[in-house]
């Protein structure tokens, strides 16, 4: 059965300008999509509803403790993006990466990988160039990262955006993943 619905602007998330694949600037307006009977037809509506439900229930507890001035509880999230940077030549030899974007097979971790030599090591010049370009692209969208560093495994790195309201952080996380792939695949 097909659901009919309507699209509404999610004014809790900021609109932004993002380049289309052909470099045309496009205004993106965050939206929600619901059926005429109220069912969520997207993934954002349940998030917004759960944020509101959490606020309502938390306010009950806050009032039990005697606080009569609070009006709302706002949740925040600061998701980390851990990622691997793989050279194009290596990528082209790995069908699992090509078809799924993930490692489906491989070898056990080399002995000694649990040591901190990569984690505390300096960031390689090519990786730092990637991180710099990534930050510049994210800043254009109003997304700021708090930290970026090597992770434990070889070629593994991390980007940690600044905490934000849950729905905005979720929107930013989707954009971060998109921009990471775009920057990594650019020549």
Give names to the regions the model predicted.
Residues 1-187:
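Glycine-rich, acidic/polar active-site loops that bind/position phosphate-bearing ligands
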């Amino acid at each position: 059965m097909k659901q009919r619905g309507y699209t509404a602007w999610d004014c809790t998330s900021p609109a932004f300008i993002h380049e289309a694949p052909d470099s045309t600037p496009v205004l993106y307006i965050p939206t929600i999509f619901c059926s005429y009977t109220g069912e969520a037809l997207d993934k954002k509506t349940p998030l917004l509803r759960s944020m509101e439900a959490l606020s309502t229930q938390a306010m009950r507890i806050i009032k039990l403790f005697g606080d009569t001035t609070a009006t709302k509880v706002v949740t925040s999230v600061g998701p980390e993006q851990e990622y691997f940077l793989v050279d194009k030549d290596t990528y082209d030899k790995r069908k699992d990466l090509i078809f799924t974007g993930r490692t489906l097979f491989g070898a056990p971790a080399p002995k000694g990988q649990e040591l901190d030599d990569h984690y505390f090591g300096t960031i390689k010049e090519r990786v730092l160039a990637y991180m710099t370009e990534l930050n510049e692209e994210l800043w254009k969208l109003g997304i700021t990262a708090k930290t970026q560093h090597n992770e434990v495994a070889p070629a593994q790195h991390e980007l940690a955006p600044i905490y934000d309201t849950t729905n905005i952080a979720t929107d930013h996380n989707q954009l971060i993943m998109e921009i990471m792939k775009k920057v990594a695949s650019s020549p």
